[in-house]
Structure formats: C-alpha cells, structure tokens
Amino acid sequence: AFCGLVGLKPTYGRVSRYGIIAYASSFDQVGPVTKNVKDAALILEVIAGKDEFDATLSSKAVTEFSNLQAPKKNMRIAYITETIETEGIDPEIKAAMYNRVKALQADGYTVEPVSFPYLKYAVPTYYVLTTAEASSNLSRYDGVHFGYRSPNATDLESTYKLSRSEGFGEEVKR
C-alpha cells in the first residue's frame, strides 16, 4: 500500500457480510487494515468462518493464516509496473516500492515487473459495475420503509427525493 498499511481482501465467501448495507454485492467484502501482514493474518483467523446469517459463506475450515510461512525457494512475486511508473507518484513512494522489491529479492524471492496495460480501464469498469449493483441494492432505502427519512418532506414524492438526496453520500448519488 502507498500508506504503509496492509489491507487484506479475503476470498469471496471467507468472511461474513451480515450486517453490511449492500452497495455492490460482488465487490462488498470485509477485511482488515493493519500495520503488518502477521496482524492481518491474525484478524482474518478471527473474522473468517461460518455465520448462520450469511448463506454465501464457504463451509471450508478456517486456516491458521498466522502460522503460514511462505517458501522462498521457487516463490515468484510480481508487481504491476503501471502502478509505480505513472505520473503523480511521489518520488519517496516510488523509492520505497523499489527498496521493498530489492529487500524481497535479497530475502530469496524472485520479484518481477509485469505490465498490465488495461489498468487505466479499472476505475471506469468499477463504476459501470458498482453503479448498476448499487441502484438495485439501495433501491429499498426510500425513506418510507427503510433508511433515512427527510424531515423536510411534505408528501410521498418529496419523501423519496429528499430522503435519497439528503441521505445518500456522493459515491451513491453518482
């Protein structure tokens, strides 16, 4: 991460999404943000596993992620060149990334750059998919049955309009 933290996005079905307001179901996942990989593994051990309120969960046993040791021999790690060699990356961040690559290589890992020329399409693709899912998932938050109800509404139509325009954030209103 560019901020010195470890973010872990678990495999779909590993951690319950029960209690989360669905924005874009195929993207919504729960995972820890920690100071190091070991802490992320420990938290994943706690939050992973069965939940009777989430039918999408895997029944596979939870691994002791914190006890896993990556074999250095024959281990290949790739990084996407376009994430580092792009306009706007702070020189200190770039240097830290390349220093980490060197440290991993010194530890015995094979670290290679890979190009992903389609990276520029990731954000537009994200918005196409998530806005479609969000419009479906959030449609029930009408200010009548679910969600925020505007105190400024005077009739049913203004309840819908004001509750959604006042109650939803900018990301949802795109």
Region spans (language model):
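Conserved dinucleotide-binding and phosphotransfer motif residues
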Residues: 107
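FAD-binding core of FAD-dependent oxidoreductases
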Residues: 1-4
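Short helix-loop capping/hinge segments that flank enzyme active sites or metal/cofactor-binding pockets
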Residues: 71-76, 132-174
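A short helix-breaking turn/cap at a secondary-structure junction
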Residues: 6-95, 100, 153-162
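Short glycine/threonine-rich loop-to-helix capping motif typified by GTGT followed
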Residues: 91-93, 123-132
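General small-molecule cofactor/ligand-binding pocket signal
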Residues: 110-115
